[in-house]
Amino acid sequence: MRSTELVHWFRQSTPYVNMHRGKTFVIMLDGDTIACPNFVNIINDISLLHSLGIKLVLVFGARYQINELLQQHQIESVYHKNIRITDLTSLELVKQAVGKLNYDIASRLSLRLPHSPLIDVVSGNFVLAQPIGVDDGIDYQLSGKIRRINTESIQQQLDRDAIVLIGPIAPSVTGESFNLPFEEIASQLAIKLKAEKLIGFSATQGILDENNQTISDLLPQDAELYLAKLIQQNQYHSSQARFLQAAIEACRFGIKRSHLISYEEDGSLLQELFTRDGVGTQLSMEHSETIRLATVSDIPALLELIRPLEQQGILVKRSREQLEMEINQYTIIDRDGVIIACAALNCYADEKMAEMACVAVHPDYRNSSRGDILLEAIQKRAKQLGIEKLFVLTTRTVHWFQERGFQLAEIADLPDKKRQHYNYQRRSKILIQALQNKKG
């Protein structure tokens, strides 16, 4: 990374460093993640998160390692409703795998980053289990479910700056040990601790669409469809499916954001948390982007967005004072507090016409659908105001508007006031669209 790129990244990440400090993250580390060569870098990045003041609870699974041990001992796993039935013989091997992973993860976290204090990693009986029991005549034996979580003790450890490490084996009140689904532990911990985020890993960079492109944002209902598809493809135990189960459940109970990233790509965790767009899939209760009317406090960001386009001659120059007077006319797209697009609606009520003006989209988002989203928002607002015709003046984007139903027009077609102030030097093309107002 060149020095200029480093400076840019560092400046961009600063708001997120401040935003995340003091918050609680629950991080899911399944057996596949732990087994991958990049895991040492993931651990280093987790240590870095801790050094930035983020409270961390690590929940690890061991399915990959357990399966290896069972195969070595020629023991075949039996499942019912996608849950492994754990007998006494299997449980001893499960304990062996989980115990080794617990020690290995704690040891790696204890390796200090240069010039950083020693990290305190704490494990304990924070989760109490109970047997699943018998279902459809099938005895789950030593496969269990959560009975209780000692959130007070976990919070005490987090408050004293320790990382809490929890595996999939938990004791019961009778002293027995039970094998629990680690995704259930992760989701319930996130819910009980009111975590800011739930984070998981998979082989791919999040959830992929039919073109193998990462889906950056998912709503719970969309996530449920992807989970159903994975189950239909017999991938119930995949990293993606287990994350989605945990994230959907967590979202139902108020965890606003969960993230799925690649365990194979170095730095994914940091890129997801400290850049505006991340690199993986975010499951949230609502989209990270909102469309809203601008306020006076948005003016500095609006100026920053439109200035480059003004300098290129694409937009007419507007002063801060003009923006202040016209701020109520602006619709913006807000992404995590950053304005990435804007457009103004200037109404000429007597002629029932309005101009869509000052259309600007941040360079990082110009090859996306933000322009269409803005246009739809402006059209909707214009209809609400009783506008029958929407027009634009443009020097560069004639075809874009024509593709969306605008027709080339003449100066004479403009409202009287706009016609009087038409800039003949710019020679802007005029396009008009008739709005179809629904009559109730």
Curated annotation (Swiss-Prot):
Main location (coarse class): cytoplasm
Disulfide bonds: none
Subcellular location: Cytoplasm
Cited PROSITE patterns: GNAT
Transmembrane segments: none
Pathway membership, UniProt: Amino-acid biosynthesis; L-arginine biosynthesis; N(2)-acetyl-L-ornithine from L-glutamate: step 1/4
Lineage top rank: taxon: Bacteria
EC supergroup of this enzyme: transferase
Pfam families per UniProt: AA_kinase (PF00696), Acetyltransf_1 (PF00583)
All residue ranges annotated as the N-acetyltransferase domain in the record: 289-429
GO CC, one annotated term: cytoplasm
Catalytic activity line of the entry: L-glutamate + acetyl-CoA = N-acetyl-L-glutamate + CoA + H(+)
Molecular function terms from GO: L-glutamate N-acetyltransferase activity
E.C. number(s) listed in UniProt: 2.3.1.1
CDD domains: AAK_NAGS-ABP (cd04237), NAT_SF (cd04301)
A Gene Ontology biological process term: L-arginine biosynthetic process
Keywords: Acyltransferase, Amino-acid biosynthesis, Arginine biosynthesis, Cytoplasm, Transferase
Similarity comment: family membership: Belongs to the acetyltransferase family. ArgA subfamily.
The protein's name: Amino-acid acetyltransferase
Organism of provenance: Pasteurella multocida (strain Pm70)
